[in-house]
């Protein structure tokens, strides 16, 4: 139990702090721990000894800037220098040498690997140690097992069979007697019997033959090896046999690590020192003792809850990077050994630096890390859709990945919410689909103890001293500590001092929820939001929503696109400011001073006699193709303080998160256009750029050298292409900045040389060569063309040339996208929908003051979904809009009084009605609703309608990126079927369901044509167009279509031969033909 330094004070920790703390632990401790494990490398004759030292290592400043690393597709890394010693004969050399580069974390808590922002997700795994469980077999007999989990994730099981014999199951197939295992680990029979509580059970099952096998350690090891490796015959004890056992079994299944040793000691009441990180015979015997106690009723029947957080540990960025560093050092060791052998062959004098500087050795470190970031499932591309995603991504915890669960095999129980999650892992925020419950998000106050890997949550201590002094101390409890405390829920208020004794409060104790007297409480929650993640904490009136809809909302807020003109919400929760601040999309003043000048690229600040240039991000592409842009917010000559906002990023206003827009909504059906969650919108949202967003797409092309050795060329001189397609190219063949480009336009002109044979030259080419001696170009045009849906303005062109023949050109195109039919919009309560129709503003329903509504939602989407929070939000938003107020409401306001949310909303509506002198704003007969009029006829609607100002987001699922059609396109070379997918211009025209529809109408000839001649009959599909145009008869080919050939080949692969016969109509003669 840890106390916080500031007694009685509790602030929300920095949301990116977890990533920074993890990386700092890796740099300060992880590197040293791995360097200490690096062995002294000696040659066989012991003439050379090479050693690295853990003390005094240094990391240099990165040689390139972060922005250049992104543009030039490089890795943002720092060079690591380590002290090394080389003994060569009698000569001893000490030197600080460079062993390679290590990726460095930037200010966002991410890494830049090959120009791409990547982040490492925290993994949550079963902690190493021992876990007991009992289960009934098919006959109803209780089976008791103890599972030992190593630090590597290897598992071994201890079990008692029907004959009361004790076995250790070291793999799925092999089980070994517990006596053989203990003896192989170094104990003799006398030591075993002296160290167990039930020696009679151990003595009951070995017969004379088995006792002989464990007479000595060598015999026990041979017996263990025979059973483990399933090897027969007479084996001879040897060092290589021991090394193989050490590598295959003991290292993988018996290394507990620091955390495993602590858990083993705690579970079995042992006092083995913490530095003993391997499984000892004493551990195995104590574990067996406990199992016997469970079986024969002398012990406590306590199954371990594998889903309790006390039995889990977090593998943070520190652990994963440290593992990779250890792996790289192992490779470095092998490389140095090879170099030493070469030294003897060449008979040259080595130095510490020359042993590690050959090209392959010096890049070992960085290539290991690049492979890790590129292939490891928890090293993900950083989600930069909006500031919220940037903050939330680093706080995710995942049960997936190496050593963890998989989406297909995880049980319901492992996905479920556990009482130990409260205040640590958000019960709401998880992914939808196959990984539901397997990826979660840390609660906003949770922190990770990086030493033990546990998640801690803060509480106020309610001790007698604290009560007397009237002060509160903040304590952080780990999951295995809070079981011993009575914890009052955070949504209960402090009690009235006078009647404390009589009052009872809801509390949590040992995973149960109770109602107990106030004086029995030990600690209480510090904040109503304490249980939720950032996504859940941004939902106003979350307590009025169904949990499934809150889950959808926290996921959809991460998909919101930054709009061209951001607007902060009228109704919020108060967490918007810190979320925006910790995303680091805004520029914050690091010192006080005076603004000299500001423009869209930089701000010049004068501070303490120095002029500081602060660069701004101008229209930079994010990983999700959204536009990142910073707008200066301080005029020239203004004095600023430290911590003040100098420039705002995308989707922030006034330092607060601003993902959507406050729009006037009505909940009513409208001619069926909002059936099944569809949304009707006004054209005002299009013409006034309310929901207009900017997107930046990147297109790149690279030159290469062909197999004949000739280089590709970037040029404007491309034969056989229309001038219209080349209109935007400059003299180098690259598109000009500021050009407007359409689908199919050439962005970069490129020619690939081809070798043509003499016979393939046309006659004119021979003539030109004979008369003028000119060679005709046989280059192939391989230019970069703008694909479908890519039209826009060229805002940047990057020309990266690593050598004369290796050139990469990147073109960035900015697109302006207004909201349109097919785009997805959503509120903050899981109320999502697709735009079905854009109405002229004069046709939209209008209020009694003549204001037309902006959006019409379906009211049937509320009762069944039980997300009533949207109703409170829209009504309070209307009041706030009329009163020019903004509200920041904490959840669970019913702790103040019953119906507190409704009372607040109605009182504000009444106040707005009074101040604006609009009685329709609050009508007592139907509060929150109002009579509104049909814009087409001017008649009032039959029923009063709920109207309000809701905060609605535009999501990244946009119709421009999804709509697709195909008339003709590419076919698969193998099956001759149309290819799949929008990216390949594919699309199967007639599928299974279309065939059913045609069968239903009995159109046999159309069906035959569509499935054969017009689809995949190679010759017929060429001829059929001609026949259709000239009105000829359809060709009737006797050979089968390609789909039939594919079927035949698939049957052949199953060893089934399908023969194809043609039967003559005249004489029924059978002619066999090969398919």
Swiss-Prot record:
Protein keywords: Chloroplast, DNA-directed RNA polymerase, Nucleotidyltransferase, Plastid, Transcription, Transferase
Compartments (UniProt record): Plastid, Chloroplast
GO molecular function: DNA binding; DNA-directed RNA polymerase activity; ribonucleoside binding
Annotated CDD domains: RNA_pol_B_RPB2
InterPro entries attached to this UniProt entry: DNA-dir_RNA_pol_bsu_ext_1_sf, DNA-dir_RNA_pol_su2, DNA-dir_RNAP_su2_dom, DNA-dir_RNAP_su2_hyb_sf, RNA_pol_bsu_bac, RNA_pol_bsu_CS, RNA_pol_Rpb2_2, RNA_pol_Rpb2_2_sf
HAMAP family to which the protein is assigned, alphabetical: RNApol_bact_RpoB
UniProt-listed NCBIfam families: PRK00405.1 (NF001616)
Quaternary structure annotation from Swiss-Prot or TrEMBL: In plastids the minimal PEP RNA polymerase catalytic core is composed of four subunits: alpha, beta, beta', and beta''. When a (nuclear-encoded) sigma factor is associated with the core the holoenzyme is formed, which can initiate transcription.
Name of this chain's protein: DNA-directed RNA polymerase subunit beta
Originating organism: Zea mays (Maize)
Taxonomic path: Eukaryota, Viridiplantae, Streptophyta, Embryophyta, Tracheophyta
């Amino acid at each position: 139990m840890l106390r916080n330094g500031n007694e009685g004070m509790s602030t929300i920790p920095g949301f990116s702090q977890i990533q920074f703390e993890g990386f700092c632990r890796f740099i300060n401790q992880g590197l040293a721990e791995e360097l200490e494990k690096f062995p002294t490398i000696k040659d066989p004759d012991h003439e050379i000894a090479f050693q690295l030292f853990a003390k005094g290592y240094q990391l240099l400043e990165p040689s390139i800037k972060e922005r250049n690393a992104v543009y030039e597709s490089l890795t943002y890394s720092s060079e690591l220098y380590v002290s090394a010693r080389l003994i060569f004969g009698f000569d001893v050399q000490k030197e600080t040498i460079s062993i390679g580069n290590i990726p460095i974390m930037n200010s966002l808590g991410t890494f830049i690997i090959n120009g791409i922002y990547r982040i490492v997700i925290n993994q949550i795994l079963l902690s190493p140690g021992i876990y007991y469980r009992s289960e009934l077999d098919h006959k109803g007999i209780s089976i008791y097992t103890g599972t030992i989990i190593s630090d590597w994730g290897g598992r071994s099981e201890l079990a008692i069979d029907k004959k009361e014999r004790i076995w250790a199951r070291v793999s799925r197939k092999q089980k070994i007697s517990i006596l053989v295992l203990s003896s192989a680990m170094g104990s003799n029979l006398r030591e075993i019997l002296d160290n167990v509580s039930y020696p009679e059970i151990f003595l009951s099952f070995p017969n004379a033959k088995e006792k002989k096998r464990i007479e000595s350690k060598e015999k026990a090891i041979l017996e263990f090896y025979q059973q483990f490796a399933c090897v027969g015959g007479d084996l001879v004890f040897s060092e290589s046999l021991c090394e193989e056992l050490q590598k295959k079994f003991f290292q993988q299944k018996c290394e507990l690590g620091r955390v495993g040793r602590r858990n083993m000691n705690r579970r079995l009441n042992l006092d083995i020192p913490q530095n003993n990180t391997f499984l000892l015979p004493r551990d195995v015997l104590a574990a067996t003792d406990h199992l016997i106690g469970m079986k024969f009723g002398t012990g406590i029947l306590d199954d371990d809850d594998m889903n309790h957080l006390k039995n889990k540990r977090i593998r943070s960025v520190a652990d994963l990077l440290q593992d990779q560093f250890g792996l790289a050092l192992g490779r470095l060791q092998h490389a140095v050994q090879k170099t030493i052998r070469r030294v003897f062959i060449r008979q040259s004098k080595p130095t510490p630096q020359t042993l590690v500087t050959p090209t392959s050795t010096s890049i070992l470190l960085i290539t290991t890390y690049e492979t890790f970031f590129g292939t490891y499932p928890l090293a993900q591309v950083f989600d930069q859709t909006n500031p919220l995603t940037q903050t939330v991504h680093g706080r995710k915890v995942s049960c997936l990945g190496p050593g963890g669960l998989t989406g297909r095999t995880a049980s319901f129980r492992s996905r479920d919410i556990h009482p130990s999650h409260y205040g640590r892992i958000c019960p709401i925020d998880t992914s939808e689909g196959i990984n539901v419950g397997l990826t979660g998000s840390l609660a906003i106050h949770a922190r990770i103890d990086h030493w033990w890997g546990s998640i801690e949550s803060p509480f106020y201590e309610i001790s007698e001293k604290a009560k007397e002094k009237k002060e509160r101390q903040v304590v952080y409890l780990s999951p295995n500590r809070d079981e011993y405390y009575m914890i009052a829920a955070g949504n209960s208020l402090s009690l009235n001092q006078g009647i404390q004794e009589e009052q009872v409060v809801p509390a949590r104790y040992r995973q149960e929820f109770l109602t107990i007297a106030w004086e029995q409480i030990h600690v209480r929650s510090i904040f109503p939001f304490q249980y939720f993640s950032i996504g859940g904490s941004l939902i106003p009136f979350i307590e009025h929503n169904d949990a499934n809809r809150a889950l959808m909302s926290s996921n959809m807020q991460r998909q919101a696109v930054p709009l061209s003109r951001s607007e902060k919400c009228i109704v919020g929760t108060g967490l918007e400011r810190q979320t925006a601040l910790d995303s680091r999309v805004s520029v914050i003043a690091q010192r006080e001073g005076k603004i000299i000048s500001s423009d869209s690229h930089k701000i010049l600040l004068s501070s303490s006699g120095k002029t500081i240039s602060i660069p701004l991000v101008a229209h930079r592409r994010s990983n999700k193709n959204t536009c990142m842009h910073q707008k200066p917010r301080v005029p020239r000559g203004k004095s600023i303080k430290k911590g003040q906002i100098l420039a705002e990023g995308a989707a922030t206003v006034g330092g607060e998160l601003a993902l959507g827009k406050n729009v006037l909504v009505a909940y009513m059906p409208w001619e069926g256009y909002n059936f099944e969650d569809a949304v009707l919108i006004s054209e005002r949202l299009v013409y006034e750029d309310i929901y207009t967003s900017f997107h930046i797409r990147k297109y790149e092309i690279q030159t290469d050298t062909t197999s004949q050795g000739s280089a590709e060329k970037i040029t404007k001189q491309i034969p056989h292409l229309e001038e219209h397609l080349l209109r935007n190219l400059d003299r180098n063949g690259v598109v000009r900045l500021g050009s407007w480009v359409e689908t199919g336009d050439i962005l970069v002109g490129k020619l690939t040389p081809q070798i043509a044979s003499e016979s393939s030259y046309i006659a004119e080419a021979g003539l030109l060569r004979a008369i003028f001696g000119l060679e005709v170009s046989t280059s192939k045009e391989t230019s970069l063309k703008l694909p479908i849906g890519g039209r826009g303005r060229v805002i940047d062109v990057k020309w990266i040339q690593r050598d004369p023949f290796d050139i990469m050109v990147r073109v960035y195109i900015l697109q302006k996208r207004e909201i349109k039919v097919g785009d997805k919009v959503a509120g903050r309560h899981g109320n999502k929908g697709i735009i079905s129709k854009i109405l002229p503003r004069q046709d939209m329903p209008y209020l009694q003051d003549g204001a037309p509504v902006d959006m019409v939602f379906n009211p049937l989407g509320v009762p069944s979904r039980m997300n009533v929070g949207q109703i409170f939000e829209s009504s309070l938003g209307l009041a706030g809009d009329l009163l020019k107020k903004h509200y920041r409401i904490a959840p669970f306001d019913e702790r103040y009084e019953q119906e507190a949310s409704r009372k607040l909303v109605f009182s504000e509506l009444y106040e707005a009605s009074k101040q604006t002198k609009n009685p329709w704003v609050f009508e007592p007969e139907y509060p929150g609703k109002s009579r509104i009029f049909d814009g087409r006829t001017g008649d009032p609607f039959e029923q009063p309608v709920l109207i309000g100002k809701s905060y609605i987001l535009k999501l990244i699922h946009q119709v421009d990126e999804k709509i697709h059609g195909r008339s003709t396109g590419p076919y698969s070379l193998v099956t001759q079927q149309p290819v799949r997918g929008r990216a390949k211009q594919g699309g199967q025209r007639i599928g299974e369901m279309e065939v059913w529809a045609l069968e239903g109408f009995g159109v046999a000839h159309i069906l035959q044509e569509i499935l054969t001649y017009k689809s995949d009959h190679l010759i017929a599909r060429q001829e059929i167009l001609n026949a259709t145009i000239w009105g000829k008869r359809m060709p009737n080919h006797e050979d089968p279509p390609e789909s039939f050939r594919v079927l035949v080949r698939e049957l052949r692969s199953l060893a089934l031969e399908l023969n194809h016969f043609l039967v003559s109509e005249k004489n029924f003669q059978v002619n066999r033909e090969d398919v």
